[in-house]
Amino acid sequence: MELYELGIKQAQEGLAKGEFSSVELTQAIIDRYHEKNGEIGAYLTFDEEGALKLAREADEKRSCAPRIAPASQLAPLGGYSLTSGKDSASPLFGIPIAIKDLINVAGQPCTCASKILKGYVSPYDATVIKNLKQNGFIPAGRVNMDEFAMGSSTENSGLGVTRNPYDLTRVPGGSSGGSAAAVGGNLCIAALGTDTGGSIRQPASFCNCVGVKPSYGRVSRFGVTAFASSLDQVGPMTKSVEDAAILLKALAGHDEMDGTTPKDPVPDYAKAIEGASMKGVKLGLAKEYLEVSGMDPEVKRLTDEAIRKCEQAGAELVEVSLPHTEYAMAVYYIIAPAEASANLARFDGVRYGHRSEKATDVFTLYTKSRAEGFGPEVKRRIIMGTYVLSSGYYDAYYGKAQKVRTLIKRDFDEAFKKVDALITPCAPTPAFKFGANQDPLTMYLNDLYTIPSALAGVCASSVPAGFTQDAKLPVGVQFVCGGFEEEKLLKVSAAFEGIR
């Protein structure tokens, strides 16, 4: 096995045994980046020199060897260094991890794949990055995404095309398409993504990797550029469920900068999944997910096969109903654009980002900067959001959508009184061809199975289930558990991973 093929657990075991160094591991990722990123396009930027300096520090601290360079030369990324105050026993110590390009890292670009932020360099770290730095990780470049996380294919990026590593004529999914392509194409050891309505889970399904959307509030949003503030969550995208458990443990926890994060202690997820089994697990089958017209036959076959394997492994199948699922798409596309229109109002060409050179007064500065900087899909959602929040329409649309959202959450609460987890398809189709879903409504349906759990704020995962028979495209299944039940979710996901 090549070093770039390793996951977090495998890499850390090899480092601990001295089979290879962090420098060798990081160099393998850099070499893979040069070999494959030209055709896949997962990364937007990669600070090779900074990553190698940190890898050298990790090796020196691990071996307690004398330093081989002055401190002034070994402090890249806004002063980040591994020489002191970091836990060299952490499973993330010296491990290169790719970062979705809306998560702020001090000293690195943060463009949200948008022309309006091209050239912007972050002056501070997001809380999730602070947490990872305490664990001694190595930032392994910025990966592409749909502009401001608005999309399901990464075709909406304003800065470049990302292709599916399993078929370069197809999309990697979105909005965390760069993260998924980097993991699935072995251009990184693991990656960070964000999920608003399915943006971790759907691309994970398309690119044959594990993706976890934590419960709303499990992971701090501070320093993550906001799309829809009541939905956004950062989560791991990895090569195994165990890797996801390791990474989620480092990401999660209370943050004074994000009032949605509780002070409850974060479990040791990796320890919790040891010996995970399907035996005795009550697995919910919701007709609203499994009896849907338009589902690709191969997705249905692989989902049915996954359910059968779970039952054979000892799971108890229980039929449940989530009756308000049919309203989830409409609710999401009222609430999310409404929040986006408010969040994106800050990008005005005055304080940072793109500033139009054609403006003659303040008003035209605002309008021209935004018109030149935002892409078509972002503009579409800003207009939708502004409309539903406008006088005379707020109660008719946004107010009612929030009421129905409460009913959707109640459906999940009732279901989890009867079952431990739900199993559903992750996306209605495998990865589709570029340009195949030009109609916005058709594109929005890619998140049909992932949006309801996002609205409910519960946790969910995508786990690889197999490949289509014809095109050999990866397909994932989704597991959903209740709010702050990530231990249970990861146990079920790991159990399925072991029997698939």
Question: How would you label these PLM feature ranges?
Answer:
Residues 60-90:
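Intrinsic disorder/low-complexity segments
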Residues 51-56, 136-137:
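Long amphipathic alpha-helix in the N-terminal Rossmann-like dinucleotide-binding domain
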Residues 41, 258-266, 281-282, 286-289, ...:
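Flexible, acidic loop-helix segments that line cofactor/substrate-binding pockets
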Residues 18, 94, 134, 188, ...:
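Glycine-rich, small-residue loops and helix-cap segments
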Residues 29, 51, 100, 132, ...:
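Conserved hydrophobic/aromatic pocket- or pore-lining residues that grip, position, or stack substrates
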